[in-house]
From Swiss-Prot:
Residues 55-77, 595-606, 741-750 have a biased composition (Basic and acidic residues). GO terms for cellular component: ISWI-type complex; RSF complex. Interacts (via the DDT domain) with CHR11 (via C-terminus). This is DDT domain-containing protein DDR4. Keywords: Nucleus, Transcription, Transcription regulation. The gene is DDR4. GO terms for biological process: regulation of DNA-templated transcription. Residues 1-125, 450-505, 532-750 are annotated as: Disordered. It comes from Arabidopsis thaliana (Mouse-ear cress). InterPro entries: DDT_dom, Rsf1-like.
């Protein structure tokens, strides 16, 4: 190996200016003279290494044209981002000399460099504390922990990342809502209750023993008999973040979270759920992280690794480079994500361009949707705030005027007054224990049952077979007609079905409470027989002249029945006054109200218990007359009844005829058209039978007298009643006048 003089030329200025002399001083001789002992092998090797480095530095630089050509050729041939150190040094010198306004940063990483696009603008002075928080990777770790393990942490408070940062800068209730659930799940259980005022003390006690396991440095806060609360509020926000990060690390080591992670991985959950993977980066220490949380917010982070090597002359092994990390919060909202994506798409790095495309395609649509939802929520809150402001404003300026509140009363005067008014209103109304239709029908059926009067000394007479057969046919329709009559108005409903007297017979007791006065009697009133006899005699004596001229016996029967019709109309007016006014087509009749003294006297003088018969039973029976040839078919049925059972007593047929006749009379009383028709038809018959009027009147008076006398003595005689079902049809009267003869006269003539 040659000496150093052969490798390194002498560049001293004396070589060029001084004249050449003949004497030459050898250079190695003084060295050999000064050396007293040989150099060690390690010293020789170190000296040779230093000489080689100096020789490499002193190499002549190539010409400038050749340098540019070489640089241009290398730029065209570069496919990978990794380049040689010599080329990087040359590019560094050129970039430093060309322009200093390039927005790209060149970071040395070991033996290579990386171009990084600047994405975060310098913050404003007012936003500097928040920017310092966002530059801490511990804050991003805490937010990720809260997002992943939220179901187990039992943190009910909802907050965004910005609100969390505000709470770290200025402590508020959000910090207590986060720390209290975390402290409850960390053993040991403390005796002190965890509240908003005591959680700082519990925090100091629980992190005292575990601090050196999860953090570096000294414990920033200790329990000082309550003074630690003020100390915590005065801490730097970065220290509060470090304390919370240590608390999260302690919490993640608990059994519930570890079992949750193990069970999730066994069920097929990907590991990236618990260990965040980067969304982009290269092999030179630049990594991008994306946090997607619809509740806390979407965030994009960038981590830059810096490795610095100090150029110092050292002996021995190579010195390790000093590696540092720079953490940046690149984007926190929709607008920032749009700006970052545009910058990444314009970058010269292929990795940054691919990340920009990924942001635009996958992340921005979801972020935009969440941004619109939050905007709507903010607008709604703004409208509500405006409404509240308008309510607070003084009357007349904006909003509605305030309404006066009713004075508060702690007594029950108003309540008692309302109850008393309600009681008065209900008392004014007519009490109706049952439906009016039910009440009227029951009263009529009682009247029908009372028509078959029996004394206490005589047994009940048997009912005619034909009448009982008819009544049994209609017994099945009782329930049906009750419900149908409830829904129909009296003026509009159909004729009621016929009922048998045996179904509605009730004995009347002398001690009946409901019949204390005649005003309480509903339906048909049954008067005393003596009173009815006197009233009939008065009517016959007063109307004898008119009856002799007209000879209208049926009109007399209508006058006898006038009292029944008037009572019926009076009851209808009480039960359904409104319905009768709306539906009735006929004018009202003037009602004759019976005197109360007469009713009381007739009821108190002679009241018989049991079934009674009304005086309406003593009516003219048109079955005893014969009609014209066209009317014989209608009367043939009645004649057959008289000769079917001649051995039976005459009272049975009379009772059976009375049942049908009384029922038919009630049907016709309910129908105004039938009633008018009944009044007109007998008049036509009586006008055509003038020759027999005198005899009929005499026999009618005799029959009335005899029947009244028999009822007083308790003897039941033979009676004949009006049966409208056996009347001749209307067409028989239209054909022409027909002579009517009595059955007695016909038998005498025959």
């Amino acid at each position: 190996m040659g000496s150093s003089s052969d490798i390194v030329p002498d560049r001293s200025p004396a070589d060029d200016v001084a004249p050449v002399t003949d004497t030459k001083i050898p250079k190695e001789e003084p060295l050999t003279l000064r050396r007293t002992r040989p150099s060690r092998a390690c010293t020789v090797r170190a000296q040779q290494r230093l000489q080689e480095l100096q020789a490499a530095e002193r190499k002549l630089k190539p010409p400038k044209k050749e340098y540019k050509r070489e640089q241009h050729r290398r730029r065209e041939e570069v496919v990978e981002e990794d380049e040689d150190s010599e080329d990087d040094d040359q590019e560094d010198e050129e970039n430093d000399g060309d322009d200093e306004s390039n927005p790209k940063q060149c970071v040395a990483g070991g033996s290579s460099t990386k171009i990084i696009t600047s994405l975060v603008p310098p913050p404003e002075p007012s936003q500097m504390p928040r920017w310092n928080l966002r530059s801490m990777w511990e804050l991003a770790s805490v937010l990720n922990f809260l997002h992943v393990f939220r179901p187990l942490l039992k943190i009910n408070a909802e907050f965004s990342a910005e609100e969390f940062e505000t709470a770290l800068l200025t402590p508020n209730d959000t910090l207590s809502d986060i720390h209290i659930p975390l402290l409850k799940a960390i053993p040991p259980v403390t005796r002190m209750a965890l509240t908003r005022d005591t959680w700082v003390t519990v925090l100091c006690r629980k992190i005292r023993d575990c601090w050196h396991w999860v953090a570096e440095g000294d414990l920033p806060i200790v329990a000082l008999q309550g003074r630690e609360i003020e100390v915590y509020k005065n801490l730097d926000p970065a220290i509060r973040v470090v304390i919370l990060k240590a608390l999260c690390d302690i919490r993640v080591e608990q059994e519930d979270i570890r079992s949750y992670i193990d069970n999730s991985l066994k069920t097929g959950v990907h590991l990236s759920v618990f260990r965040k993977d980067r969304v982009g980066g290269d092999s030179h220490g630049v990594n991008f992280w994306y946090e997607e949380d619809p509740l806390i917010g979407h965030r994009l982070y960038r981590e830059i690794r810096k490795a610095e090597v100090l150029k110092v002359k050292t002996k021995g092994s190579k010195i390790l480079p000093n590696i540092t990390y720079q953490w940046e919060t690149v984007a926190t909202n929709f607008d920032e994500f749009q700006d970052v994506s545009e910058k990444l798409l314009q970058s010269s790095s292929r990795i940054e361009v691919s990340l920009g495309k990924k942001l635009v395609k996958d992340m921005l649509p979801e972020i935009e949707k969440e941004h619109k939802r939050k905007e709507k929520l903010l607008k709604k809150q703004h409208r509500q705030a405006l409404l509240l402001d308008n309510f607070v404003v003084v009357d007349g300026l904006a909003g509605r005027s305030l309404r006066d509140r009713k004075p508060v009363r702690y007594t029950f005067d108003d309540y008692d007054k309302s109850i008393n008014d309600a009681i008065k209103i209900t008392k004014k109304k007519h009490p109706s224990p049952e439906h009016p239709l039910h009440r009227r029908e029951s009263a009529r059926l009682d009247a029908l049952a009372n028509g078959r009067s029996t004394s206490s000394t005589h047994p009940t007479e048997p009912v005619n077979d034909t009448a009982s057969g008819r009544s049994s046919d209609f017994a099945d329709y009782d329930d049906f007609d009750e419900h149908r009559d409830e829904s129909l108005d009296r003026r509009r409903r159909q004729r009621p079905q016929r009922y048998s007297a045996t179904d509605f017979v009730e004995t009347v007791s002398d001690n009946e409470v409901e019949f204390q006065s005649d005003d309480d009697i509903y339906g048909e009133a049954v008067y005393d027989e003596e009173y009815l006899k006197k009233r009939k005699q008065k009517k016959l004596s007063s109307g004898s002249e008119g009856d002799e001229e007209k000879g209208d016996e049926e009109y007399k029967w209508d006058e006898d029945n006038a009292e029944y019709e008037e009572e019926e109309e009076e009851e209808e007016e009480e039960d359904s006054l409104s319905a009768s006014e709306e539906d009735s087509d006929e004018p009202r009749r003037a009602k004759k109200m019976p005197r109360r003294e007469t009713k009381l006297r007739s009821r108190s003088n002679d009241f018989r218990p049991g079934l009674r018969r009304s005086k309406r039973a003593t009516r003219i029976d048109y079955q005893q007359y014969e009609f014209s040839d066209s009317d014989k078919e209608a009367t043939g049925l009645a004649k057959r009844k008289r000769f079917v059972e001649p051995d039976e007593p005459s009272d049975e047929t009379g009772n059976g005829d009375f049942t049908m006749g009384s029922q038919d009379s009630e049907e016709n009383a309910n129908d105004p058209e039938t009633k008018s028709g009944e009044e007109e038809e007998p008049r036509d018959v009586n006008d055509n039978a003038d020759t027999t009027n005198g005899k009929e009147n005499n026999q009618l008076n005799k029959s009335n007298g005899t029947t009244d006398q028999e009822e007083v003595e308790g003897v039941v005689g033979k009676r004949r009643y009006l049966d409208l079902n056996e009347l001749a049809p209307v067409s028989g009267f239209d054909d022409g006048p027909s002579t009517v003869l009595k059955d007695d006269d016909k038998t005498d003539n025959s």
